[in-house]
């Protein structure tokens, strides 16, 4: 009988995952990860983990499976929280959920599970796994969840073959309503519980306040750039190589404060991210202002009016070689090769047609249509049909 450790988070998805595995004849152990209890950085004023670990315990009791709590707050702080601060400090916008899956759930947590004699680790993610044979070797595929509204394959875009080989996603073929229905039939305490939001396993987080505890506020200016600024109408040079063209298309525009008018003050450029409109606190404009760029060196935020301001859109992005990750290592591009894919630059974005171009120092992702708010530090993930085959950090 195969043994599976389920990461019980105290939510409905992982509860139903545990139940389904039990139905399939696995020996199931429930493990709750405690990821946070550093009082020096308060992340929010509620403490959901007590309630969550209690719900996880009640589910385990109801299913009659062994249950224990593991404290991963040290690893979490080192791998996730410090990474977030460092990224924000550099003016990049991290994605802690993607990292949490790679570094915590499918690494630290997985090692604990394997030390308990588990054959697999299961989570309540809406995604699927299948396997094929390539050159006589088993290759694992990361497939999107059947529920289009809930597909979470994007959050798993950094997993390796090794991690996938030991992972199970029992609810990947179900929709959210079906999952809730099973939980209700089984009278699981989590059946009606609403979905957790935000930072994986820490509950709700209010970012600027959380950041202010480590990154000191410093006042800077908010500058508005006109949509007709000449920076948006640069003539295309003739005779450029494909790589040079892609480089220009993916580059950050070089804004300077004197190009626009000062609209107000802010408390630190590193608290803002491209595409953001809340929190600018600038009045007196007919249309909403959006952040089109931040400059942490001069501590300036550049903004534009409306969500179709040209400063928000780009057709290409670059991923440095060290940050290109292939889930399907067998499909990895060699220098000079290209691949047509469907890609997304954020969770739940509808998939976009794009072409990957691999060069000596990294990869360009070139989209058929201009993309809004391509954000440094976020992950781009690429798919072949419904299979996520690779990802990278937008640089």
From Swiss-Prot:
Its main location: cytoplasm. GO terms for molecular function: ATP binding; tRNA binding; tRNA-uridine 2-sulfurtransferase activity. One of its GO terms (biological process) is tRNA wobble position uridine thiolation. It holds the Pfam family tRNA_Me_trans_M. Its EC number is 2.8.1.13. NCBIfam families: PRK00143.1, trmU. This is tRNA-specific 2-thiouridylase MnmA. The gene is mnmA.
